[in-house]
Amino acid sequence: MATFHFDLVSPEQVAFSGEVDQVDIPGAEGDFGVLAGHAPVVAVIRPGILTVTAGGAQQKIVVLGGIAEVSEKGLTVLADVATAVADLDMQDFAATIATMEQQLPGKVGDVLDRSIERLDHYKSIQHQISTTAMH
C-alpha cells in the first residue's frame, strides 16, 4: 500500500509526524478516510477519534476539533486538542463529563446550547473508546 506523510499538531505538541497508510478523520460533515493520492481538501474536524494506520498497526487519538488539510504534500491536521487514547485517563475523562453535567443547570441560552453540544461530544468519545477504540 502506498504511504503519505501525516502531521498531527496541537497547540501543546506535535502529536504525530510520519509516513502512514491511512488516516480516518471525524469530519464535521461526516467521517472520512485519507489514503495516498487523496484529492486536495480542507475540512473542519469535529470532536472524536482519529485513527492512524501505519505498517499494519493502528493508533487512535482523541481530537477535540480542528482543521484537516490534504495536499500534494500529504495530510496536516491542526487539532485544538490531541491525546492518544492509550494516554487518556478514563477516570479523569469520566470526572470531566460528570462536572460538565453538574454545571448544566446554571447555564441558559447559547451558553447552554454550546455546553450541551460539548457534553454530547465528550459522551460520544467516551462511548467510542469503551466499545471500539481498543480493538
Curated annotation (Swiss-Prot):
Q: Where does it reside? A: Cell inner membrane
What is one term from the GO cellular component aspect held by the record?
plasma membrane
CDD domains recorded = F1-ATPase_delta
Q: Does the keyword Membrane apply?
A: yes
Membrane topology type, per the record?
Answer: Peripheral membrane protein
What is a single molecular function from GO for this protein? ATP binding
**Where does the sequence pass through the membrane?**
none
Has the keyword Membrane been applied to this entry? Answer: yes
Just give the chief location class.
membrane
Q: Which UniProt keywords apply?
A: ATP synthesis, Cell inner membrane, Cell membrane, CF(1), Hydrogen ion transport, Ion transport, Membrane, Transport
NCBIfam families per UniProt? ATP_synt_epsi, PRK13448.1
> Can you state the subunit structure given in the record?
F-type ATPases have 2 components, CF(1) - the catalytic core - and CF(0) - the membrane proton channel. CF(1) has five subunits: alpha(3), beta(3), gamma(1), delta(1), epsilon(1). CF(0) has three main subunits: a, b and c.
Q: What does this protein do?
A: Produces ATP from ADP in the presence of a proton gradient across the membrane.
UniProt lists the family membership as follows:
Belongs to the ATPase epsilon chain family.
Q: What is this protein called?
A: ATP synthase epsilon chain
- Species for this entry: Rhodopseudomonas palustris (strain BisB5)
Q: Which gene encodes it?
A: atpC
